[in-house]
Structure formats: structure tokens, C-alpha cells
Amino acid sequence: MTNIVHKLTNSDIQQLMSKIPFETSQLSQGMKAKTKYKGTSISIYNSNKVMFQGKDAERIAAQLLPNVTKSQPSSKKASTTKQTISYNQFQCIGSDEAGSGDYFGPLTVCAAYVSHKNVQILKALGVDDSKKLTDTKIVELAEQLVTFIPHSLLVMNNEKYNEKQKAGWSQVKMKAVLHNEAIKNVTQKIDTTELDYIVIDQFAEAGVYKRYALSDLPFSNKTKFETKGESKSIAIAAASIISRYAFVKHMDRLTQSVKTDIPKGASNKVDLTAAKIIERKGIAYLDSISKKHFANRKKAENLVQKKYND
């Protein structure tokens, strides 16, 4: 099956939607309209990108968008420095996490599978290292990716996180268990005979990861660990965007629930916010929405004590 993606202007989209009927209700998040035309699925996204999927996708795209430059699959190898494997030339599962360095909010982990046919689509959509993307862009991209990329998203809420930490689990162990579980879930959704590599954004040495993962690694001989993996594998970049999306949406809901802006990270601003929450709702509530072992907790308590002792 061929996949073609174009970035359109509002005028282009209006012209396209005037040529054939589109469905504009009961759509996936991030989608503006969809239809099926002569066996080709056509999806228009809020980002003004349109995706044609089907064996005749290229011909249908050329027919309906005659004035738009044709997307061409790239056969050029990705440039590498120290990297020895050009992962984007292969079919990979990538995994990454979000929230591990944030006092507030959960730990989210995602594994995502990117096939040959989807590499160019992800590039056309603008999939990149999530650290380079705004939260708004992450939400926009993730809501498109989850509609067609096989993936598994796991969320460890603060109650479970604090329970495991109290039981002696390090954060590295938590991440290893979640990464391994997410990867296993994805292998059950794809034809693994077509899988070339499993690429994990490295947060621990391979031996440590394997020791902490609690169960055997699926396809251990195909598993690789890469530092700064998002820039080396588009599968990791996709997983990173989806895991970050889940974290961002959780933080948005938390902000609405607490009725105050909940900052990300572990800065002095976080200490001040935590102190305000202690005053308003108590330390137990703070623990229910945060990672209890972070130093921010003690700093917030000190701020509250100082306020009432001065």
C-alpha cells in the first residue's frame, strides 16, 4: 500500500473538499475530514496535511491535487556520524518516556512501530525530536500518529509510582519494566517477521536494563540502545511524541483540577507551586499528584514552615 502526504493551503483544502464528498463527523482527534475515493482513503488533518492511503494513492493524489508538487519517497540514506545503523532505512519499534524528570505528573512510556511505508509519512508530518517541539505541536502530531501507527502507551500514575519507589524500585527499574511491557504489546500488534530492530532511547546500560526488566526482552538479538535516540530513529521520535502527549494532557487536566498552573520540571517555580498546594490542600494531596521522593517536596515544606515562622 502506498502512502502520500501533502501540506495544503486552506484554499487547496476547500477545492479538494468541493471535488468529492467528505465525512466531517465522528472523526479521530486531530482530523478535519475523511473519505474513501476509488479505493483510496483520504484523511485531512487540522494541521492542513492530507494523507492518501492505498495502492493507487499517488495517482488519486495527482488527479485531485494537480497543482500540488508530488511527494516522492526518498531512497537517500540518512547521514550518520558515530551512529552505525541508519534506523530509518529499517522497520523498527522505538520506545521512549516522558515525565521522569518532572516532580508533578505521571511517568509515561510509549513504544511505536514504524514501517518502511510510514517513514516518509512521519517525515512529511514533521515528526522530530519532541524536545524541539512545543506542547501544541506535540498534541497536533500525536493526535495524528495514534490513528495509524501501531503503538502501546503505558502510564504509571503518581500513586503507583510512589508505591513502587517506597518498595525499593529505582526510577530506572520502573522505566525498564514499562519500556519492556510496551514493546511486548507492540510486537503483538504487528507481523514480527518484518521487524528489523527494536531501538530504545537509552536511560541505562543494556545489562542494567535487562536485569531490571523483570521478563525476557522480546527479540533480544534485535534490540539496540541509543543515546539521543530521537535524532537517530524516527520510531523513537514517534514514541517520544506520543508519550510526551500523554504527559502534557495529564498536566493540563491537573492544572484544571487544582485551579492553578502546574509547572513541568523540578525548578524553584515547582517548589513554590508545591508549597501553595500544601497550604491549600495538604501534604497528602500533594503526594497524590507528585513523585514523592523528589527534593521539591522537602523544599516546599521548608517554604511553608518559613512563611509561618517568620
Curated annotation (Swiss-Prot):
All copies of domain RNase H type-2, residue ranges: 90-306
The protein's name in its UniProt record: Ribonuclease HIII
Any single GO BP term: DNA replication, removal of RNA primer
Purpose: Endonuclease that specifically degrades the RNA of RNA-DNA hybrids.
Cofactor: Mn(2+); Mg(2+)
MF annotations from Gene Ontology: magnesium ion binding; RNA binding; RNA-DNA hybrid ribonuclease activity
Cofactor info, note text: Manganese or magnesium. Binds 1 divalent metal ion per monomer in the absence of substrate. May bind a second metal ion after substrate binding.
Pfam families in the record: DUF3378 (PF11858), RNase_HII (PF01351)
Residue numbers binding a divalent metal cation: 96-97, 201
Family statement drawn from the similarity comment of this UniProt entry: Belongs to the RNase HII family. RnhC subfamily.
Locations listed in the record: Cytoplasm
PANTHER family named in the record: RIBONUCLEASE, RIBONUCLEASE H2 SUBUNIT A
Keywords, comma-separated and alphabetical: Cytoplasm, Endonuclease, Hydrolase, Magnesium, Metal-binding, Nuclease
InterPro entries linked: RNase_HII/HIII (IPR001352), RNase_HII/HIII_dom (IPR024567), RNase_HIII (IPR004641), RNase_HIII_N (IPR024568), RNaseH-like_sf (IPR012337), RNaseH_sf (IPR036397), TBP_dom_sf (IPR012295)
Class of this enzyme: hydrolase
GO-annotated cellular components: cytoplasm; ribonuclease H2 complex
Main location as per UniProt: cytoplasm
EC number annotated for this UniProt entry: 3.1.26.4
Catalytic activity: Endonucleolytic cleavage to 5'-phosphomonoester
